[in-house]
Swiss-Prot record:
Region (Disordered): 71-90
Compartment(s): Cytoplasm
Source organism per UniProt: Kocuria rhizophila (strain ATCC 9341 / DSM 348 / NBRC 103217 / DC2201)
Location (main, coarse): cytoplasm
InterPro entries xref list: UreE, UreE_C_dom, UreE_N, UreE_N_sf
SUPFAM superfamilies: Urease metallochaperone UreE, C-terminal domain, Urease metallochaperone UreE, N-terminal domain
Family, per entry: Belongs to the UreE family.
GO MF annotation list: nickel cation binding; unfolded protein binding
S-S bridge residues: none
Function: Involved in urease metallocenter assembly. Binds nickel. Probably functions as a nickel donor during metallocenter assembly.
Keyword Chaperone: yes
GO cellular component, one term: cytoplasm
Name listed for the protein in its UniProt record: Urease accessory protein UreE
Amino acid sequence: MIVTEILGNIHEDSGRELVAGRHVEKVVLPSAELVKRIQRLRTDHDRQIGLRLPAGAPDLRDGDVVAVEDAAPSGAGHGDGEQDGTGAPGRGNAVVIQVLPTDVLVIGARSVVEMAFVAHSLGNRHLQAQFFDADSEYGAEVMVVQYDHTVQDFLDHHGVPYSRQERVMPVPFRHAEHTH
């Protein structure tokens, strides 16, 4: 099977409707693999899938539905049809992306001045960061970066509050290319 588009996301109503009543196979990926448009994937049922997204396609995200297959007609090699766990005939299969948690530092600076200092200092290292507001799952305004022991040392040295966590990030961290 070759996947050429993202059909929806199970974290949204339309994506949940796509997979409702279907057997869900998962493709488990680390965050770094989400940015690759062309790759070979393997489901948790050991099925191989080719991914060939067009240029300009968005990065993969946790919960993306990349394939939906209808159930084989009764008597077509599946006995009395696929089951969805309720005892009712199933609607077929769906393949969904599941992202592994990323080791991150969640930085909760105490003021906008402290956050600007941290962001500027880490920006000079060309480190990718994601920012979240108080309405996010973090419940506070925070900056999140991939774990790096030198960043942890920097934060400790300057007394900046942070916590090290494993998180499924909403968007992948990208490598920051830079030349002088």
